[in-house]
């Protein structure tokens, strides 16, 4: 009975892929895959990739005298450097995308103090949670 069972398993295809046992044996006997031929040596490629470094991006060139003057005036008005960078990035991105709330005048899409975002972005949000920094 066992011999008949093994004979059926070995000779009959088990699925649409053919005889599973034969496929397993062929897979075991297969040699190692050959290495792909690359035209550039590995150390040369790594040397090239490691030489590509992005320079640190400044929003505005601080070496220009008018930018230094604006920066000093900004600090004199009581803002810190992080606030300066935030405001610069905000004003420089004005008009780039049309997705701003109320046509690009307000920086935030909804009230920052709200525990959840707006259900409908086209409605006003009145109440005590309004963030007055944006007005």
Swiss-Prot record:
| Entry keywords, A to Z | Cell membrane, Cleavage on pair of basic residues, Cytoplasm, Membrane, Secreted, Signal
Q: Name one Pfam family in it.
A: Augurin
Cystine bridges: none
- The answer to whether the entry has keyword Cell membrane is yes
One GO cellular component term, please give it: apical plasma membrane
The source's domain of life comes to Eukaryota
**Where does the secretion signal sit in this chain?**
1-18
Subcellular localization(s) per the UniProt record:
Secreted; Cytoplasm; Apical cell membrane
Positions of the propeptide removed during maturation: 19-55, 120-135
Q: What InterPro entries does the database record attribute to this sequence?
A: Augurin
Q: Does the keyword Secreted apply?
A: yes
Where would you say this protein principally sits, based on its record? secreted
Which family does the similarity line name?
Answer: Belongs to the augurin family.
Q: What does this protein do?
A: Probable hormone that may attenuate cell proliferation and induce senescence in the central nervous system.
The entry's protein name is Augurin
Q: Which organism is it from?
A: Xenopus tropicalis (Western clawed frog)
């Amino acid at each position: 009975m066992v011999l008949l069972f093994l004979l059926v398993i070995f000779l009959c295809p088990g699925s649409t892929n053919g005889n599973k046992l034969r496929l397993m044996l062929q897979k075991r006997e297969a040699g190692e895959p050959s290495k792909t031929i690359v035209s550039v040596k590995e150390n040369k490629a790594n040397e090239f990739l490691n030489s590509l470094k992005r320079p640190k991006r400044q929003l505005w060139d601080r070496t220009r005298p008018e930018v230094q003057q604006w920066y000093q005036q900004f600090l004199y008005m009581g803002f810190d450097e992080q606030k300066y960078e935030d405001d610069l990035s905000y004003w420089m991105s004005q008009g780039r995308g049309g997705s701003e709330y109320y046509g690009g005048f307000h920086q935030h899409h909804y009230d920052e103090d709200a525990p959840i975002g707006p259900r409908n972005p086209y409605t006003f949000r009145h109440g005590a949670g309004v963030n007055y920094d944006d007005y």
